Every structure is written in C-alpha cells, then in structure tokens.
Design a protein with these regions (language model features):
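Surface-exposed acidic/polar loop and edge beta-strand patches at domain peripheries
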Residues: 16-175, 179, 183-221
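Short, Lys/Arg-enriched N-terminal segments with co-localized hydrophobic residues
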Residues: 3-16
Length: 221
C-alpha cells in the first residue's frame, strides 16, 4: 500500500487531471503522469530519464525534447535529452577512482587529449518500474536499478548496490528523490548529479531569436 502525497493547497483541483498511465514513446515504454497542471514522461528503460516535463497551463516545455526522437537516439545521447540521472558524474582523470579502501580503474570514454572517464553508466541502463499512482494531490512514479555482476561495468566497479528513484508531480512542480543502498562489504563512492537539459525556446510556439540570456557578473577578471 503506497503512501498518499502530502502536498496541500487552497488551489481548486480537478481529480480527473491527476493520472499515471503506461504508454509508449517512439519504441520505448514510458509512464506518462500528470498533476498540478504539469505533464511528464518517465522513460524507465532509458535510465529513468524524465524525457519530458511540460507546464500545461502556461505552455512551457522545460527540458530539451523532440517528439520525433527514437528510443535509440535518446539512449545513444542520453546526457543531452530530458533529465538524465548520473552516478559518478563529471570526469575522472585517466579513469582512476580512489576510495578509502580501494583504487578502481574505470574505462576511459573521453579519449585523447582528455583521457577521462565521464558520467558513469546509470543513465544508459534499463531500469525497472516499481509502481505508479495518482491521488488528489499528485502523481508518483517509482523506479529502481539493481547493480551487480550482471552489469558489464561491474568488472571495473565491483560494488553491488541498488538505486531507487521517486518522481512526484504536483502543483509545486517536479520533485526528484534518489536513494542508493550499498549491498557490498566495500566502501561505495557516492557522486550523483542530474545532467539537466533546458529547452530553447521555453514557450510553445516561441522563437529562438526572441531569447535573451542574462548572466550576472560579480567579478571582472
């Protein structure tokens, strides 16, 4: 039995607007979920990527999204679409990862002249859909990935763990919770990030030539 969402507001709601459903997006199963005026799609077999987040009231497409993208396009370039979740993000020089009890040699996937391991592997794996549901306050999708010797990356990082993801849509927007559980007797390195890709233009029907980017400069070098 799942817990109910705990958001509350004086805003009038239509219960029929809150839903979750399994559907397909260009060759991959997704959970479409909607609540609080937002609609999103969780592609659990594409690394639990939230490949779309849309503000239905204001016509805003938050993440980089292309309705014609195939699953293979997203899978091959998962870091540049939607909201991918990265375990071991950023760069490890020469692929070397040191913990308090071991030194691991990760595969170098950013070649010369950089010679780094970059962004890990979790965003490229097929995750498992645990559950999805909606109530009068929100819509929730839960997924997980179990990392063990069946993963080809295990030869480089032999530390069993589970990664659990909870995505909640409400009038507050999208909430993203992540839980890692170390299933080994070794020290597990923890480094996690979302590689958020922002859509341009934001607004449905917007034009790129109308976009202005303002970056505050506090110090001139």
């Amino acid at each position: 039995m799942h817990e109910k969402c705990v958001f509350s507001s004086d805003t009038e709601r239509n219960l029929k607007m809150n839903y979750t459903k399994i559907t397909e997006f260009n060759g991959t199963p997704v959970v479409e979920f909607s609540a609080g005026g937002y609609t999103a799609m969780a592609a659990y077999e594409l690394g639990s990527n939230i490949i779309r987040l849309h503000d239905d009231k204001n016509g805003v497409e938050f993440f980089r999204f292309n309705k014609d993208n195939s699953a293979d396009v997203i899978r091959q370039s998962s870091e540049v679409w939607g909201l991918p979740s990265l375990y071991l993000p950023n760069r490890f020089a020469d692929g070397i990862l040191k913990t308090s009890d071991a030194v691991y040699h990760l595969p170098v996937n950013e070649k010369a002249p950089y010679n780094n391991h970059i962004h890990g592997f979790l965003q490229k794996r097929a995750h498992t859909l645990v559950e999805h549901y909606a109530d009068d306050n929100c819509a929730v999708v839960k997924t997980m990935y179990r990392y063990d010797e069946n993963d080809e990356f295990f030869q480089y990082l032999p530390i069993k763990f589970t990664a659990e993801f909870t995505f909640t849509l409400s009038e507050c927007g999208l909430e993203h919770k992540v839980k890692f559980t170390n299933l080994s007797d070794k020290m597990m390195p923890i480094s996690f990030a979302t590689h958020t890709t922002i859509n341009s233009p934001f607004v449905d029907g917007g034009k790129e030539e109308n976009i202005r980017l303002f970056v505050p400069a506090e110090k001139r070098c």
